[in-house]
Structures are given as C-alpha cells and as structure tokens.
Amino acid sequence: MMVENPQILVVEDVESNFLYLNAVLSKINANIFWAKNGKEAVDIFRNQKNIDLILMDLQMPEMNGYEATRIIKLENPLVPIIAQTAFAMSDDREKALEAGCDDYLAKPIKSKDLLNTVEKYLNGR
C-alpha cells in the first residue's frame, strides 16, 4: 500500500522542470519540497525528518546530485533516491547508482514513467 500524502523532495535547478514534476506528483497528493541545488537538498533533508522519497537532478550548481546523494545516503541509507538527468548515457546511470541512487529517469521524463517509478518505491517502504 502506498504512503498517503508522501513527502517528496524534488531537487532541480530549472524552475520549469520543477513545475512539471510538481504538477505530475500532485496527482498522488504528494507534499513537495523544492531544493535548487545539492546543498539545499541536504539542508531540507536534515530539517524535514519525514522525507519519503527524493527526485535528484544530477547536474546542478553549488553541489551536484552525486555528492548530495552520497551525503544523504550516509545519514539515511533507506530513503529512496531517484536520479533524473538529461545526460542519458549509460556511464551516468552507473555513476548515479554508485553514488547511492536507487533508480534513474532520463529527461525528458514522461509523467507515466515518473509516477510508476515513484509509486514502486513508495509501495516498497
């Protein structure tokens, strides 16, 4: 059974991409937190103790998604982190998984793929 009103941290530096993800995730009544870079993501994760899932952009200013993922996974190995990036090369996927991401979505992300992936991890918790 899926978490009701899941708390999802969306880490995305491009506002139009965030607004799209936010619109799609509103279909599952998610409470969305927005971080514009990896540093903000780590800060929000530390302050919001009940994050159910993180959608992590990999290429961002200040602190990239790989580094933010490593820090968050050290603090809570159980929180699912789904990488999202326009760099859909296989080595990016491997780098994301090595950093601790649980899954990977290539941009542009189809709403169906996003919801299926998010629901898979929320159901597994």
Predicted regions and their residues:
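C-terminal output helix
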Residues: 109-118
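Active-site beta3 strand of CheY-like receiver
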Residues: 49-55
